[in-house]
């Protein structure tokens, strides 16, 4: 009887295991991911054209390659309206160009060039040349009406816009932080910054009529107030912030 009992238990376990695993052998898919259809992306693009609270971020380590999409703009959340490319915005290869083009065409997500503005020619002065040599900057005088420096500023601003045109970016994000270690001959001179922004504003920003964005981040509350109408967005960074009320105060003072 003991032997029969053991056999009965083993047989019962065998059947329960067999029937318990039978669902694994089903050949028909019962629950699987479906990619969004054309209507989803059309609605997403249309939504981003409406007046709404935008989603923004900085995007670094961009390659446009990799199965995980962590280094691709296509891997960004669908709700992101625009991003500022940090560090790897220049000399775009086909992978990054294709990634940027696809995310804009499919999701309506836009990409901006972004870097710190401190000195004339930052990020664009050719290697081996000085700002004085390449841009015609006169470092001997910071007079607001110095014709050499005003011309150098115009040349620099237009070079930024030329870069935007070359790679089909959607605008420029000025990282402006004069009170956090980045005060220079350009960023520390209100007259020069206003001339710089006005020159940019002829080709990008709300006054240009091009649809390309001009954005300022970091310390927009510190920029010369006359420049305000030339920007699409002000982005306040939380350096030394004490809380939401402090950030609101900074924004309201722009």
Spans of model-derived segments:
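Chitinase-like catalytic core of GlcNAc-active glycosidases
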Residues: 51-254
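Bacterial Sec-dependent N-terminal signal peptides
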Residues: 1-8, 12-51
């Amino acid at each position: 009887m003991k032997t029969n009992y053991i056999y009965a238990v083993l047989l019962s376990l065998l059947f329960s295991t067999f029937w318990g695993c039978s669902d694994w052998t089903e050949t028909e898919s019962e629950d699987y991911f479906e990619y969004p259809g054309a209507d989803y992306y059309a609605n997403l693009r249309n939504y981003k054209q409406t007046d709404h609270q935008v989603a923004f971020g900085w995007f670094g380590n961009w390659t446009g390659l990799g199965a995980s999409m962590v280094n691709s703009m296509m891997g960004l959340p669908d709700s992101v309206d625009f991003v500022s490319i940090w560090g790897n915005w220049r000399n775009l290869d086909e992978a990054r160009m294709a990634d940027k083009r696809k995310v804009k065409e499919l999701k309506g997500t836009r990409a901006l060039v972004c870097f710190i503005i401190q000195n004339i020619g930052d990020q664009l002065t050719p290697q081996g040349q000085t700002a004085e040599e390449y841009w015609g900057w006169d470092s001997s005088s910071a007079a607001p009406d110095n014709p050499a420096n005003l011309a150098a500023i115009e040349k620099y601003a237009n070079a930024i816009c030329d870069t935007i045109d070359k790679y089909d970016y959607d605008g420029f994000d000025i990282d402006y932080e004069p009170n956090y270690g980045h005060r220079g001959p350009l960023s520390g001179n209100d007259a020069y910054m206003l001339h710089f922004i006005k020159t940019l504003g002829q080709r990008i920003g709300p006054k240009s009529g091009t649809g390309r964005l001009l954005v300022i981040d970091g310390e927009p509350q510190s920029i010369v107030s006359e420049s305000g109408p030339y920007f699409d967005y002000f982005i306040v960074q939380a350096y030394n912030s004490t809380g939401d009320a402090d950030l609101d105060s900074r924004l309201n003072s722009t």
